[in-house]
């Protein structure tokens, strides 16, 4: 992994937990910060971040929209912003999860931190680049190969 903490923005608490568990199992210092944590646990995550003990931090877009959180991030070295399930930006952003649209502030707030977006289900119309209007360092859409013709 690169120097600093990578921020992974993920839509679901269960997905965060599964990915953090897998990372920790593989020796990577990963944590999540979401609404399932109490204030003591959140304070512990903040402490670990400030002490540079975290390589991967999983958050929901709602966490990124909190000014206190983004101010804290400015005080630690960041290696990457990774937007997981990036198709949610267009599918959920306008109605169900409006804080996905706040992610478009990443380049202005953190101009020297690379941004990557990952999805397996985006269509051309739901491309994260279209809705974020931000330069992505990497946009990865994985689609199944077409079935062979018989």
Regions of interest found by a model, annotated:
Residues 4-7, 29, 53-57, 77-80, ...:
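Loop/turn-to-beta-strand initiation segments
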Residues 135-139, 144-148:
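Short linear motifs in low-complexity or flexible loops
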